[in-house]
Amino acid sequence: FGTTSEGNSLSVEERVNLLETLVEGNIPPAMLMPSTGTCALTETVRLTKYAVSKGCAGVLMLPPFYYKAVDDDALFASYSEVIQQVGSSMLRIYLYNIPPISQVPISLTLIGKLLKHYPDVVVGLKDSSGNWDNTAAVLQEYPSLATFCGSEKFLLDILRHGGAGTITATANINTSNICNLFKNWKSSDAEELQEKITAIRQIFDGHALIP
């Protein structure tokens, strides 16, 4: 239930029902990372609890995004409250940084504070900032964090810098090339594979993906 799938246009009940349908359809929960971050604390907690109860590998969590210019202390308090209310040792959070949409960036300072207080819970980040310098800074500062880029244009770069990979909607239509590069990023033709991937991604970048 991420950005391209318009997850935040769905009600909590719809998101719960969709997740239940996926699990009942024999999609292994260990392969699922539903997005559970909303503007309402109670809704985020409910969605996250449900994902944990279903055995999902983790949750992708936006910060509360309606109010802008919120400082790191306030964002830390929000994430902390969710973690405490969910209250499960099985919870694994992947922070979702997408400032072009949310207008609420997840800073290096906030990441560090969350890792210090919740090292077993906050385990990863999807960086959809669209700014490679930001992604590179996260990789350098927090090498143990499972960091994903939000655009496959950076897939080879992120793998070469120790990142985890990419989480991208367009992987649904460019699956073969992206999987090939992910598996063979050390090969001699890795640059060529990346060029193919980038060319296809740029076609979509020229259009609005959300109607």
Predicted feature residues:
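NAD(P)-dependent Rossmann-like dehydrogenase/reductase catalytic/cofactor-binding core
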Residues: 210-211
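Active-site beta->alpha loop and helix N-cap motifs at the rims of alpha/beta catalytic domains
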Residues: 1-105, 122
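Catalytic alpha/beta core domains of metabolic enzymes, predominantly
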Residues: 85-91, 99-207
